Amino acid sequence: MCRIVGAPRTLLPLLAALLQASVDASGEISLCKTGFPEDVYSAVLSRDVLEGQPLLNVKFSNCNGKRKVQYESSEPADFKVDEDGMVYAVRSFPLSSEHSKFLIYAQDKETQEKWQVAVKLSLKPALPEDSVKESREIEEIVFPRQVTKHNGYLQRQKRDWVIPPINLPENSRGPFPQELVRIRSDRDKNLSLRYSVTGPGADQPPTGIFIINPISGQLSVTKPLDRELIARFHLRAHAVDINGNQVENPIDIVINVIDMNDNRPEFLHQVWNGTVPEGSKPGTYVMTVTAIDADDPNALNGMLRYRILSQAPSTPSPNMFTINNETGDIITVAAGLDREKVQQYTLIIQATDMEGNPTYGLSNTATAVITVTDVNDNPPEFTAMTFYGEVPENRVDVIVANLTVTDKDQPHTPAWNAIYRISGGDPAGRFAIQTDPNSNDGLVTVVKPIDFETNRMYVLTVAAENQVPLAKGIQHPPQSTATVSVTVIDVNENPYFAPNPKIIRQEEGLHAGTVLTTFTAQDPDRYMQQNIRYTKLSDPANWLKIDSVNGQITTIAVLDRESPNVKANIYNATFLASDNGIPPMSGTGTLQIYLLDINDNAPQVLPQEAEICETPDPNSINITALDYDIDPNAGPFAFDLPLSPVTIKRNWTITRLNGDFAQLNLKIKFLEAGIYEVPIIITDSGNPPKSNISILRVKVCQCDSNGDCTDVDRIVGAGLGTGAIIAILLCIIILLILVLMFVVWMKRRDKERQAKQLLIDPEDDVRDNILKYDEEGGGEEDQDYDLSQLQQPDTVEPDAIKPVGIRRLDERPIHAEPQYPVRSAAPHPGDIGDFINEGLKAADNDPTAPPYDSLLVFDYEGSGSTAGSLSSLNSSSSGGEQDYDYLNDWGPRFKKLADMYGGGDD
């Protein structure tokens, strides 16, 4: 059997816990038996038990491997067992006879079958110092052997054990490296092994604190340790062969750093501030001071004690305060705290570790400043019994008197701040008292207007007290009282209208000169004989006037409810009343005229413009009516179309949807695109009703499948790009050029045709019939032609030009021609023959005149007609006389022409 030891030179020997399983003397393997393989587990400890310390490992034989057991301790307050059978200490306690024995239970979770085993702990007695030194050379930690399984049976080897932690004091002086323990494996007899340690302090930061001899397994520390930096090191020891193959499972080595008293207590603050009310009873809590120690708080090195070293001043007693030596709470221990005598105390506080041991403990000091706070032990007192003030009537927010008090308490504290109140003489609440925060004076202020004619003087009773009540035991009364006499000064007051505003109800449409009402003001100055005059101050529509003496209001224009100056049927006018006092005063009054509606506005169509498609389906326009009147003079409305012109009802139809809306639709299947003005008759429901023909501008346009207009304006408005617009404009310009070229070509062709027609013999130019143009029923009833229009043919107005349409070949073109010499006017409108002869002479002598005057050619309308065609008028130079007798055969419509040219004598 191997003995496990290990400890630094400065500590008592550390004996490792040793567990040994019993084996048969013959070394044969016994049959598997469910339960604990040992009757008693023993562990030998080198020191008292620490909280969380692993003690030993108990094993439960589970032959079939299917049982799931749960471990319990008979002393759960002291020991606990993990699922793997490791036993730990629940708390720290000195190992004694009552803690040396306990039981461990294992219970099957399914069958509830239960087993138990006893555990015995013993403390190895301390060895003499010489023995320790000798034993150090052989103290070693041996890698444990594991229980192996062979053919379903357990073969017992070395029993598992737990290595107790190694304790090292901090701040050790060496020499370094300082040997701690030797780690070895029992396989070193047959194999060449190499040892190593890993973990923080070895190969992890902070590295190099612990080293191990790879050959001998000797573990050493290389420098002093500091518990305040690292209180525990957790290392793992490894054993491998020369090829680096793991020979043993790693074992855990815990090194605890033992605390030394190397840190003084430190106060959280060097100066502590606290307060205590004056007159406090003994035992009153004041404040708490706190110090901390970096040493182990569970050891004497970190256990602090407090005490008061000094008190200044020492009146009325040198021991006015005491401190709890463990918690640092400062309380009063004597009566007599008086702020008026001592306002502040200064205490020197000391904190000492080692539970306050003055010989071995380290100490530090701090200052505690305790301020004695004031309490209300002095009430405020008025400096006079009566205060005086005066105020003009109708003035508010003015100070009429200052109330002064004295208070012996600390200024600007609740015990010094005064609160004033009026206890009598002001039932209507016309006065108020505010406290000046700087001087503590009471400011008597008027908060409601005071009327001299009602009351000429006020006598107020006021009281003053502090914000907080007086302290108990004070014999003074809690408040002080005084009297305030306020005199009211008479002033000229404003006249006032009553009621204001004044509301009257009138129908709109009243004619000018109608008396509406009388609006007068009253003068509150009853003791003054004053006259009041009235003027108009505001009349937005200039509808009213007021009599300056009696206040009678009369209309000067027609009242209109629909005026923009009328809001919510109410018209507001403001009037001014002025007296002749010194100084003169004035007041305003508002007259509100509620105008009753009459049916004086005809309805109008809304909207005034709309769009519709060329085809009726789907096509409709929803319209409504706008009537500035209100119910019952507005809706419901009646919608209809007028009878004239007939195209309205022929093209359109209107359907009434309800009292406010109607629908306008196309009646025909197709209407050419354009702008149409559709008159709509709208009638309201007034009594009597009022009608109006309102024009709705309808834009008829081509539509897409969705019923939306597709005209160019809409397309451009829809956001066409600049390039698209330029392309469209170019296309339009090209089209216009083509049209112009076509027109030029047509005119040139007309000239060629006219030239050919001039060569036709007049005798052969016989028309078979005469076509009628613009026949609109009946013949020309007015035969009295105005021949005066022939006097100046070249001054005919452009409106007389025949519109573009079917034109005769021999008709003069409409476009501009060169300006020819002006021919003389005929001497008389009736002498048409002389006029024509003079015109022919002028044409013959004019080299620039076109040949239109030589021969007039009319459109050829066929041959073989019994009636001859109209002949042209020949000039005198053309040769021969023209025979107009055939005009008599053309019927009554040409009678005038036959009379003019048929007479040979004329």
Swiss-Prot record:
Residues 863-880 have a biased composition (Low complexity). GO terms for molecular function: beta-catenin binding; cadherin binding; calcium ion binding. Glycans are attached at N190, N273, N325, N357, N402, N572, N622, N651, N692. CDD domains: Cadherin_repeat. Residues 160-267, 268-392, 393-497, 498-603, 604-714 form the Cadherin domain. Ca(2+) 3 binds at N261, N263, D293, N301, D353. It is found in: Cell membrane; Cell membrane, Sarcolemma; Cell junction; Cell surface. Residues 747-906 are cytoplasmic. Residues 26-159 form a propeptide. Residues 1-25 form the signal peptide. PROSITE patterns: CADHERIN_1, CADHERIN_2. Residues 160-724 are extracellular. The chain crosses the membrane at residues 725-746. Ca(2+) 1 binds at E170, D226, E228, D262. It is a single-pass type I membrane protein. One of its GO terms (biological process) is homophilic cell adhesion via plasma membrane adhesion molecules. Detected in liver, kidney, heart and brain capillaries. Cleaved by MMP24. Ectodomain cleavage leads to the generation of a soluble 90 kDa N-terminal soluble fragment and a 45 kDa membrane-bound C-terminal fragment 1 (CTF1), which is further cleaved by gamma-secretase into a 35 kDa. Cleavage in neural stem cells by MMP24 affects CDH2-mediated anchorage of neural stem cells to ependymocytes in the adult subependymal zone, leading to modulate neural stem cell quiescence. Calcium-dependent cell adhesion protein; preferentially mediates homotypic cell-cell adhesion by dimerization with a CDH2 chain from another cell. Cadherins may thus contribute to the sorting of heterogeneous cell types. Acts as a regulator of neural stem cells quiescence by mediating anchorage of neural stem cells to ependymocytes in the adult subependymal zone: upon cleavage by MMP24, CDH2-mediated anchorage is affected, leading to modulate neural stem cell quiescence. Homodimer (via extracellular region). Can also form heterodimers with other cadherins (via extracellular region). Dimerization occurs in trans, i.e. with a cadherin chain from another cell. Interacts with CDCP1. Interacts with PCDH8; this complex may also include TAOK2. The interaction with PCDH8 may lead to internalization through TAOK2/p38 MAPK pathway. Identified in a complex containing FGFR4, NCAM1, CDH2, PLCG1, FRS2, SRC, SHC1, GAP43 and CTTN. May interact with OBSCN (via protein kinase domain 2). Interacts with FBXO45. This is Cadherin-2.
